[in-house]
Swiss-Prot record:
It comes from Acinetobacter baumannii (strain AB0057). Coiled coil: none annotated. InterPro entries: ATP_synth_OSCP/delta_N_sf, ATPase_OSCP/d_CS, ATPase_OSCP/dsu. Its main location: membrane. F(1)F(0) ATP synthase produces ATP from ADP in the presence of a proton or sodium gradient. F-type ATPases consist of two structural domains, F(1) containing the extramembraneous catalytic core and F(0) containing the membrane proton channel, linked together by a central stalk and a peripheral stalk. During catalysis, ATP synthesis in the catalytic domain of F(1) is coupled via a rotary mechanism of the central stalk subunits to proton translocation. This protein is part of the stalk that links CF(0) to CF(1). It either transmits conformational changes from CF(0) to CF(1) or is implicated in proton conduction. Belongs to the ATPase delta chain family. NCBIfam families: ATP_synt_delta (TIGR01145), PRK05758.2-2 (NF004402). This is ATP synthase subunit delta.
Amino acid sequence: MAELLTLARPYAKAAFAYASEQGATDNWSNALQVLSAAVQDEAFSAYLNRPELTPAEQVKSFAKVLGEDQSQAVSNFLTLLADNDRLVLLPEIAAEYEQLKSQNNNNVDVVIESAFPLTAEQEQLLKSALEKRFNSTVTVSVEVKPELIAGVVIRAGDQVIDDSALNKLEKMRTRLLA
């Protein structure tokens, strides 16, 4: 996963830089989401991975998926990905692009994993604290993960704040076995 993200990051940065320059970040965002979904579709992915398909034919397949939404710039981007055998990275490129877009809009997407469902008040308190910490607007999504036992794990981009009982038990175990 980390390797795919490492490969996808330069493509996402280039796409975002171009889209920002052209004032078309939302159009690119929509196109990348559609392309990402197409690549994740098993039937379409199997069709794309046929050895007899040339990169140009792969790009034509995406043109059918996007229809009128495909600009020349998106077509050129797809050609670059196809020529370098990187079409499989589209989901990671789309995710990284969205993260860059959020950063540019001074917005941070945060995932809070909790052992138990959070009340609206708890969620609001966490959101306020995170907005102060990141000095940005925060968009929160909450996931319930009982395996954490207690506490929360907060993920914002590549930052992780792990205050779960599971993590504390693992640290204790490591110290005792050392």
